[in-house]
Amino acid sequence: MAAIPTPRLHRGVTHLSRQTKSRARHPMSTPQHTPMMQQYLALKREHADKLLFYRMGDFYELFYEDAEKASRLLDITLTARGASAGNPIKMAGIPYHAAEGYLARLVKMGESVAIAEQIGDPALAKGPVERKVVRIVTPGTLTDAALLDDKRDNLVLAVNMVKGVLGLAWLSLASGEFKIMQASVEDLASELERLKPAELVIPDDTGLAAFEGISTPKKKLPPWQFDIESSKLALTRHFGTRDLAGFGADTLPVAVGAAGALLEYVKSTQGVNPAHISALSVEDAGELIRMDAATRRNLELTETIRGEASPTLASLLDTCATSMGSRLLGHWLHHPMRNHGKLARRHGAVRALLSRYQDVHAELDQVSDIERITSRVALRSARPRDLSALRDSLTALSGVKALAASLDSELLNELAGVLPTESPVQKMLAAAILPEPATFLRDGGVINDGFSPVLDELRAIQTDCGDFLLKLEAREKERTGITTLKVEFNRVHGFYIEVSKAQSDKVPDDYRRRQTLKNAERYITPELKEFEDKALTAQDRALALEKQLYEALLDQLAPHIAELKLIAQAVAALDVLSAFAQRAAIGNYAEPQFVPEPKLDIVAGRHPVVEAEVERFIANDTRLSAERKLLLITGPNMGGKSTYMRQNALITLLAHVGSFVPADSAVIGPIDRIFTRIGASDDLAGGRSTFMVEMTETANILNNASEHSLVLMDEVGRGTSTFDGLALAWAIARALIEKNRAYTLFATHYFELTTLAGEYPAVANVHLSAVEHKDRIVFLHHVEDGPASQSYGLAVAQLAGVPAKVIRDARRHLAELENQSAARVQPDLFSAPAPASEPELSPAMDRLQEIDPDVLSPRQALEILYELKKLAD
């Protein structure tokens, strides 16, 4: 993006000295101010938490503290002009035609902006021109194409927490998708990672501890706006329903509270009713494979661990022709499904597209972002080129429809059925909008020729002006005999007939003098005056009529919003399925098979992203079942353990979003969750060490993994002392085998853990092979049965460039340690007696665990206290 130039300043503006800056504080008692500043301050009071863009002619001006802040954030000049209430008025301005670029920068910084436009006619105003805030731009409520990321949904999320229950409501204003769910408060972090909202809406009495370390901009609302009954009323009024049962939301009161607050907040920012928000849907976590925040980060689904957009799974798969497809792809990757029937339909569609994806892409290349254009139509913010793009996109869909309908896939045929053959919207727009309309309605040149006879006549006056003047000049020369006569126009005096002074005595009686010059006279005739009146008003009248016709067209499009949203969804799904087919064809992916029994059987699996980045990738098998639940993986650092574990998680995830998978074959049983404990770093904002982060993630796995979960554990226990880490790793592995019984890939450098395979039939040792030759190590990246023979730590250090002297010292010290270890008998950590069972709890402790202090009245609490004392005695 080109740099936005600093706007030209008004003449007579002086820079503020430091001394002046320190004095420029404005009192809010408006009688001391000029009428215009009174108007500004009244608007500012209503939007005190936002920057106020105040329209003055061709500029948006910011005043006082807003001017200081904008100057700092946008690097525009801070100035002062005049005074109000005895203080210099700090101000900074930006040209209105460049406002979108500045808004984009402010929104990326998390700022919200209220835009006040002139709505009165300056010619009729006796005081300041009437102004009002017509739009509020916040990070989560963007709809303008210039402010949005084409490939990512822009969500605003409302959070409501009541007695340990988490209610979430989120909305993409750019698409109209409105969803809710309820969960446990402990799920907040994972949901924020999944949804990645651009803005949070929370009650202002919510404790900030819950949002510690979360940099997402937050809008705080009064708690009463989250009231359940008020929210139900707001939602049913908006949707025109008696209750929320039809949406499945009647049993989710905390989420309904969030949804009501969110809807009212969004309405307050738009200035119009968001009619495209036509339904509320409940997200059922039970239908999805759940992943916590750490898992989504570690698998690098849509951004790398470093926060970059590539290389990720999404960047690899995203060959979508439309922005709608790219956004839906990201959504699918974060929402893997458990329903094998629905997945089989997606896999069938991918199979049918394997030889036709190029044709689908060619057709979809002509389709614009129907989804976001539809939302702008509903919000009445659609620009002329939005409508021409919508018209052209609907025209192009006939080819896509025919292609999808011809393929052997139930899902593709259903999607084809949604696409129109002849769209009434397309016909309406073809008649109303010019083939290449102007960018902005204010410039005219938007409404098609022939759509309005009155508009055609007004345009003809402007177009025929030159011809009329030439004909009039020729006729007047012939009538008067004045060969030097000229008919001309200027902005000051309008149209006139100019005659030299030497021939001014020849002018007819109907000539009326308009201006006298040194060597000429200028005249006007009744005919020329009549034409002048028509010509000078024709442009203004044409612009006013175009605006009127455009607004009427938006009204006519409103009933078709729901239909257009369905079309957009169908196009996006076709686009994603075609991208899946392209990756499957290029990467030689296999169609996965689902079975009801516990199984994860992958033959020649590959890591999809790493495979695309290297010349040659070593494929590996994975076999897990009810009898073989945990693979204990050993081998050298850089040997490929982490890549091997991640590839199995990604293959599993790809199968559950409807894609083919990078393997020769994959047979997968029921999966409910995917967990990863891979890598860690200090959580400085949360005040947690690397080891604390590691243990928190491990605790989450041990407390929530089931026999249908896939668990990846990499080097657990390495962040503490050797014996502490070894003991923890052993106990964690044991718990995963005995209690959770999850499918587990457990990578470790603690070779002592390999003895677990002798204790538990469900444990199998595997290792990543490597060979050492002349103090050099070669990683083979191949998974083989059995434990690794050694760690190759010194060889890896040498490969990393550690100085040779350090390597020699390490070898010498390693030999000494190995000799000492062989000379003394070391206690066998794993032959120690089984841990004693936990002591039975006392009756008082049993009773204490049953109590929920949040629901007790003071009297009940006192009674229970006496009861506990009696039990303790």
Curated annotation (Swiss-Prot):
Gene Ontology molecular-function annotations: ATP binding; ATP-dependent DNA damage sensor activity; damaged DNA binding; mismatched DNA binding
Record field: compositional bias (Basic residues): 8-26
GO BP terms, alphabetized: mismatch repair
Segments for region (Disordered): 1-34
Record-linked InterPro entries: DNA_mismatch_repair_MutS, DNA_mismatch_repair_MutS-lik_N, DNA_mismatch_repair_MutS/MSH, DNA_mismatch_repair_MutS_C, DNA_mismatch_repair_MutS_clamp, DNA_mismatch_repair_MutS_core, DNA_mismatch_repair_MutS_N, DNA_mismatch_repair_MutS_sf
Alphabetized Pfam families for the sequence: MutS_I, MutS_II, MutS_III, MutS_IV, MutS_V
Keyword DNA repair attributed: yes
Cellular component terms (Gene Ontology): cytosol
Stored SMART domains: MUTSac, MUTSd
Keywords: ATP-binding, DNA damage, DNA repair, DNA-binding, Nucleotide-binding
Keyword DNA repair: yes
Residues holding ATP: 635-642
Classification via PANTHER family: DNA MISMATCH REPAIR PROTEIN MSH1, MITOCHONDRIAL (PTHR11361:SF34), DNA MISMATCH REPAIR PROTEIN MUTS FAMILY MEMBER (PTHR11361)
Biological function: This protein is involved in the repair of mismatches in DNA. It is possible that it carries out the mismatch recognition step. This protein has a weak ATPase activity.
Family stated for the protein in its record: Belongs to the DNA mismatch repair MutS family.
Protein name: DNA mismatch repair protein MutS
Protein source organism: Chromobacterium violaceum (strain ATCC 12472 / DSM 30191 / JCM 1249 / CCUG 213 / NBRC 12614 / NCIMB 9131 / NCTC 9757 / MK)
